[in-house]
């Protein structure tokens, strides 16, 4: 065989071998065993504080429900009935929207709202803050219609709707803004009949004038409610670390603090204050966003609380302040839980959230959960409307003309030392005044200035 032929054959073999090796390199896929470090470095299971999930319709809901019937007012105090009403509303089909605010002057609006002077009786769903229209659009079966961006703090549902298409109303009481919404509901008649049949057993309320400008719905007689005692369960710092940091493996603890666990990854900072029972997670070098509408902030916060598993108790959206800080309060028996000003249980009883565009700027919350089962209950009597009015007229800590809301609440009362997990939930009247939530108790008579309260 000639030398040239031998060279050609060898060259061909080398080319084939090279192609085989190249193909092997390009198609090779490593088979890491389960639990290997390589797999863990590329895919991290997202941890949550609590596995419980919560829909937007469970986070944004009315604080109170009242029936207004020819000048009489009744509070819907049956939790099962409340749930029946609120869970059915998302199934109502919205057929049309119309602004009818111009139909009423100031006196006519009040008569229409409260069912006075021949106006039809209505069910009133009251929210603790104004809710943007795009949130209602998300909650209900609502087609994409053009509308002016507005917010509402009431849904009114008339009792005497007999047509197939019913009328309900989104109302901003302070602005006297009324949006008439035409809906179709298969269960409307059953719900409204059930309410009407139970109305006589509901506690009766009246409008009480407090200060020189406003009226508030308060009970005609003292109310009997349950005082409850709970053993709180502390949530471990490591649980917050795993849920809140994007990469917990690079987080380091700062040991220069007493009775506090402070952790950072260089960008974010987690501060767990054990004596104050408070957790704060902050992002550094970010500026608070002021460009978002309230509806967007509620949706972003809902997603963040869902993604981090923040539903350690049943939290509901409560309000948003002028700094665009959103507050979510624990609700027990559909009643908000606030902190006592005289004997507070830690520094906060709410989750607060602030945003810097698409990044969380600040997340603050309690480091414990209450649970749902009290270890002890006992009956207690709550002031009637006349007593509430008299107490507020005697106190000098707050200007009664600055009161925005008065509502039922549970206040968290510390029963002993800072380390004791026992806490008492005491029924109390509360007011929103000067942007703060303040319990209405006889402690007000001993205050000289309006420096206490929960923002």
Swiss-Prot record:
Protein known as: Two-component system WalR/WalK regulatory protein YycH
Gene3D superfamilies recorded: 3.10.450.310, YycH protein, domain 2
Keywords: Calcium, Cell membrane, Membrane, Metal-binding, Transmembrane, Transmembrane helix
Record topological domains on the Extracellular side: 29-455
Spans traversing the lipid bilayer: 8-28
Cytoplasmic compartment segments: 1-7
Residues where Ca(2+) binds: 69-70, 115, 117, 119
Membrane topology, from the record: Single-pass membrane protein
Pfam family, one: YycH
Protein location: Cell membrane
């Amino acid at each position: 065989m000639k030398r040239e032929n031998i060279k050609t054959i060898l060259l061909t073999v080398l080319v084939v071998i090279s192609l085989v090796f190249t193909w092997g390199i390009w198609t090779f896929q490593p088979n890491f065993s389960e639990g290997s470090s390589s797999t863990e470095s590329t895919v991290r299971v997202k941890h949550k504080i609590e596995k419980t999930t919560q829909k937007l319709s469970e986070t944004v809901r009315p604080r109170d429900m009242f029936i207004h019937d020819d000048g009489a007012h009744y509070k819907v105090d049956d939790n099962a009935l409340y749930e029946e009403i609120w869970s059915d509303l998302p199934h109502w089909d919205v057929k049309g929207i119309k602004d009818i605010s111009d139909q009423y002057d100031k006196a006519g609006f009040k008569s229409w709202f409260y069912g006075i002077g021949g106006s039809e009786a209505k069910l009133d769903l009251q929210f603790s803050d104004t809710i943007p229209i795009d949130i209602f659009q998300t909650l209900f079966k609502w087609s994409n219609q053009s509308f002016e961006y507005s917010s509402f703090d009431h849904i009114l549902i008339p009792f005497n709707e007999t047509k197939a298409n019913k009328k309900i109303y989104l109302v901003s009481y302070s602005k006297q803004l009324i949006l008439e919404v035409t809906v179709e509901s298969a269960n409307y008649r059953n719900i409204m009949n059930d309410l009407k049949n139970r109305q006589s057993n509901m506690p009766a309320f009246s409008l009480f004038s407090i200060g020189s400008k406003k009226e508030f719905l308060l009970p005609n007689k003292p109310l009997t409610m349950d005082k409850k005692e709970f053993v709180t369960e502390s949530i471990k710092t490591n649980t917050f670390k795993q849920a809140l940091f994007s990469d917990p493996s690079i987080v380091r603890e700062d040991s220069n603090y007493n009775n506090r666990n402070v952790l950072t990854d260089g960008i974010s900072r987690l501060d767990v204050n054990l004596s104050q029972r408070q957790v704060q997670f902050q992002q550094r070098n970010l500026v608070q966003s002021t460009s978002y509408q309230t509806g967007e902030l509620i949706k972003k916060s809902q997603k963040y609380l869902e993604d981090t598993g923040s539903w350690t108790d049943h939290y509901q959206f409560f309000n948003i302040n002028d700094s665009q800080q959103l507050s979510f309060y624990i609700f027990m028996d559909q009643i908000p839980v606030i902190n006592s000003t005289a004997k507070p249980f830690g520094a906060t009883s709410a989750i607060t959230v602030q945003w810097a565009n698409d990044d969380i700027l600040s997340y603050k919350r309690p480091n414990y959960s209450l649970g749902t089962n009290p270890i002890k209950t006992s009956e207690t009597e709550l002031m009637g409307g006349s007593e509430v009015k008299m107490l507020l007229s005697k106190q000098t800590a707050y200007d009664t003309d600055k009161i925005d809301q008065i509502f039922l609440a549970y206040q968290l009362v510390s029963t002993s030392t800072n380390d004791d997990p026992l806490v008492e939930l005491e029924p109390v009247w509360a007011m929103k005044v000067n942007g703060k939530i303040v319990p209405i108790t006889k402690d007000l008579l001993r205050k000289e200035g309006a420096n206490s309260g929960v923002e």
